[in-house]
Amino acid sequence: MLNKNNILERLNDLKPFLQKEYSVKNIGLFGSFSNNSFSDESDIDIFVEFEKPIGWKVFTLEIYLEKTFGRKIDLVTKNALKEQIKDRILKQVKYV
C-alpha cells in the first residue's frame, strides 16, 4: 500500500531520471499523502520545479508518474499555485 515514505523513496530513486528526461530541479510531495490523511480515492499531489520550461512535456511527466504509482497524480508547479494557497502548499511540500 502506498504511503508517504514509499512515495518519497520512489521519487528519490526516480529523481536522476526525472532531472535528465524532464529537467526537474526539485520534486516533492504535498497534500493528503504528505500529512497521512489519504484515502483509497486520494490522488498523489506532487510539486515540481523545472530547470527550464518543458512545455507540453509536463503532461508526459504526469502520465509517467501515474503509471509509476498506479494512481492519479496532481502535478503542480509554483506558477500554477493560486496566491491564496501558495504559502500553505509551499510549507507543506516534502522534497526529495
What residues fall within each predicted segment?
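Short, well-ordered beta-strand segments
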Residues: 28, 45-47
